[in-house]
Structures are given as structure tokens and as C-alpha cells.
């Protein structure tokens, strides 16, 4: 039985995800609002349609062999300020012809649960999720990290890192993007 509120739910999902395909998908099928929500998340996620594992060895590999420059935002599913910090990163690179990768690393959820949060990170290149013992992974990233999010690491073209809790300052962003 279809509820009289399901058409409204479909419209609300379309507005929340900013995805015209949600409206198209739900037209004539108001009972499919749940599937429409996931379709909108997948479309909004852009390139990040999968979640890569991030274990104790991943950070060293990314620093030695990963793209440069690049940004990594370490976040949790309940971090209310992380999307705003990611928006600062996205705003810093969106006018550039060669955009550095902007990556999100989920610390508390993986797989489809992590992908549900992809819509919060507009412009994200890749999503990772902790895979292993969280304290050991954090230790591998930064032994001084006090387990506070958002935790942002900017890797410049030379492989030098800048680390900050919260959004990076304009000076940090300039230094990150101007390194030869």
C-alpha cells in the first residue's frame, strides 16, 4: 500500500540530493524513494563510486607513490564540521586546470555505509575507509594526531605535508598549491 506522503518524500529526496535523476526515477513510482536516495548519492559522489581500504600501510604508500599534490580529509560518519572543511578544499582547487585529488577517509564506516556520506564531499576524487585497528592506523598517519576530526593533510608537489584539525587556512592552501 502506498502512503500519501511517498510522492512528497521523493520530491524531498530530489531536493536534498540536488539530483534531477531522482525525480525522473521516482516519477510514476513513488514507492521507490529509498532506491532513489541511493541513486542520487551515487550520482553526487562523482568519481568516488567505490571505497578503497585504508590500513596501517596505506598512508606510507600514498606519501611515497600517491598523487602530488593531493588532499586527504579524515572524517567520521558523525562529524558535523567535516563537509565544511572539505568545501574549503574544493573551493581552493575548483578554478584550476590541473586539480589535485581531494580524498575523504572514513574512520568509522566502510563500503556502502561510507558511500552514503559521499554526497557531503562535493568534488571528492576518492573515498577510503579505515580497514583495521583505528588507533594503529591513526598512529601511522600522525603519532601526534589527537583523534579529532576533521583532520586534513595537504601533500604538496614535493611530498611535503601540512596537517591541521579543521579547515586549512588560506596561507596553508596557497603554500600547498604553489609548491613547484
Residue ranges and their predicted role:
Residues 1-53, 160-163, 174-175, 180:
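N-terminal targeting signals for export/organelle localization
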Residues 131-176:
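Thiol/disulfide oxidoreductase modules built on the thioredoxin-like
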Residues 83-96:
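Typically the conserved alpha-helix immediately C-terminal to a functionally engaged Cys/Sec
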Residues 99-114, 123-133:
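Thiol-based oxidoreductase modules, predominantly thioredoxin-like and allied folds used
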Residues 112-126, 139-147:
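Structural alpha/beta surface segment adjacent to cysteine/selenocysteine redox centers
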Residues 48-69:
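A short beta-strand-turn-helix
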Residues 79-83, 152:
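The canonical Cys-X-X-Cys-His
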Residues 64-80:
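Short active-site neighborhood of thiol/selenol oxidoreductases, capturing the structured segment around
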Amino acid at each position: 500500500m502506498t502512503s500519501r506522503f511517498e510522492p512528497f518524500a521523493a520530491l524531498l529526496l530530489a531536493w536534498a540530493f540536488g539530483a534531477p535523476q531522482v525525480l525522473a526515477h521516482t516519477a510514476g513510482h513513488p514507492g521507490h524513494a529509498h532506491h532513489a536516495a541511493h541513486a542520487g548519492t551515487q550520482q553526487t559522489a562523482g568519481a568516488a563510486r567505490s571505497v578503497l581500504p585504508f590500513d596501517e600501510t596505506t598512508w606510507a604508500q600514498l606519501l611515497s607513490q600517491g598523487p602530488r599534490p593531493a588532499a586527504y580529509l579524515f572524517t567520521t560518519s558523525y562529524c558535523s564540521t567535516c563537509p565544511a572543511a572539505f568545501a574549503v578544499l574544493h573551493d581552493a582547487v575548483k578554478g584550476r586546470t590541473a586539480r589535485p585529488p581531494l580524498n575523504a577517509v572514513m574512520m568509522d564506516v566502510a563500503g556502502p555505509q561510507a558511500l552514503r556520506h559521499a554526497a557531503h564531499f562535493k568534488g571528492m576524487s576518492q573515498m577510503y575507509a579505515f580497514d583495521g585497528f583505528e588507533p594503529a592506523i591513526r598512529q601511522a598517519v600522525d603519532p601526534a594526531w589527537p583523534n579529532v576530526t576533521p583532520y586534513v593533510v595537504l601533500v604538496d608537489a614535493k611530498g611535503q605535508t601540512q596537517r591541521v584539525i579543521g579547515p586549512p587556512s588560506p596561507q596553508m592552501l596557497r603554500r600547498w598549491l604553489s609548491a613547484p
